[in-house]
């Protein structure tokens, strides 16, 4: 029977920090009148003829079922008393850099996953603190004292479990999963909550009657590899709390894009959006093939006079999903000022990339 060794490094101390509803929280901090109000970062559909999409929202808005990538129109229907804010992304980036400076006070092993979340390896740290839990509490305290923002923290021996833990008690939560607790923690977790298991994989796992970590634990390694290829190899280990991916402080930020130049100018909106969809499909397929996900979607439009417009939207969660990339691309285009000039070039880019957690490994890599 095909079997690979199970090597589990439980000696590390990893923290995952995730800011709570970051964009909305910054707006609420800067404008105290927003306190206790549902806040949605996205264009107000009453001002755009129903066009637009939700970038993120605060917890008050989430109570109404509002979530990232939802159309602004639907968000308004669910929560008509919400305050819509178009968003100041350069300001959010500035605040994100301030948060990163706080991380650097504790360790240089910081792997930013996006503007508002990062992994930290504090196995050895600048303050010589042996307890990772104490470091996490100090970071939460520093962020609150210096920036008046809250974050949630997950502490464990690897990135996979630390990421899951940070999402366990939001907002302002701290969840610790020790090596001896990992198996029980994962058993109870719905498979859809496993970081890196996408929507299509969840559906396939459900078809196998796998709904929780406990269900996944019952499936043999060879069966998972047979059904999912390299991803199955990784799933088998994740179910057992095994993930030895290092914190990479120098990870390279890349983007995945698709753009086309048209010899015959595009004037009709339906034609333009059909081409946007083709670009979005190519981007999604490339991201899935590269095992990358991204949080920022950018579109580029060049007109017949060679004037060029680019506009971006940052999402709550990373994606490689075609439907999401396509919908957001169309929404961004709808926000551009009308231009009667023909379109010469269209592009869609996914950036703010990170590795898809649970990325698939070639069996040759294990030789």
From Swiss-Prot:
PROSITE patterns: UMUC. Its main location: cytoplasm. The active site is at residue 117. Mg(2+) binds at residues 18, 116. NCBIfam families: PRK02406.1 (NF002677). Monomer. This is DNA polymerase IV. It comes from Streptococcus thermophilus (strain ATCC BAA-491 / LMD-9). The lineage of its organism: Bacteria, Bacillati, Bacillota, Bacilli, Lactobacillales.
């Amino acid at each position: 029977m095909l079997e690979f060794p199970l090597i589990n490094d439980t000696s590390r101390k990893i923290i995952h920090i995730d800011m709570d509803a970051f964009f909305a929280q910054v707006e609420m901090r800067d404008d105290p009148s927003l306190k206790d109000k549902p806040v949605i970062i996205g264009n107000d559909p009453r001002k755009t003829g129903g066009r637009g999409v939700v970038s993120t929202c605060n917890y008050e808005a989430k109570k109404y079922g509002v979530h990232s990538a939802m159309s602004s129109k639907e968000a308004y229907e669910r929560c008509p008393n919400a305050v819509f804010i178009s968003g100041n992304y350069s300001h959010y980036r500035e605040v994100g850099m301030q948060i990163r400076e706080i991380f650097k006070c504790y360790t240089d092993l910081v792997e930013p996953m996006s503007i508002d979340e990062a992994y930290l390896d504090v196995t050895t740290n600048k303050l010589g603190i042996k307890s990772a839990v104490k470091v996490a509490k100090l970071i939460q305290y520093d962020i609150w004292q210096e920036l008046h923002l809250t974050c949630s923290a997950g502490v464990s021996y690897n990135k996979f479990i630390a990421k899951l833990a940070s999402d366990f008690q939001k907002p302002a939560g701290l969840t610790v999963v020790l090596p001896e607790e990992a198996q029980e923690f994962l058993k109870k977790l719905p498979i859809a909550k496993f970081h890196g298991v996408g929507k299509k994989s969840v559906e396939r796992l459900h078809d196998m009657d796998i709904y929780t970590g406990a269900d996944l634990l019952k499936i043999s390694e060879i069966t998972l590899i047979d059904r999912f290829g390299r991803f199955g190899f990784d799933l088998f280990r994740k179910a057992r709390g095994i993930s030895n991916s290092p914190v990479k402080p120098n990870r390279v930020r890349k983007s995945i894009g698709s753009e086309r130049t048209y010899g015959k100018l595009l004037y009709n909106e339906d034609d333009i959006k059909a081409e946007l969809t083709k670009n979005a499909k190519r981007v999604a397929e490339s991201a899935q093939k590269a095992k990358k996900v991204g949080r920022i979607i950018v579109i580029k439009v060049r007109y017949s006079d060679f004037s060029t417009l680019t506009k971006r939207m940052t999402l709550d969660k990373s994606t490689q999903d075609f439907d999401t990339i396509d919908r957001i691309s169309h929404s961004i285009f709808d926000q551009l000022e009308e231009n009667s000039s023909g379109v010469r070039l269209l592009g869609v880019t996914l950036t703010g990339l990170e590795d898809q957690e649970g990325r698939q490994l070639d069996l040759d890599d294990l030789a």
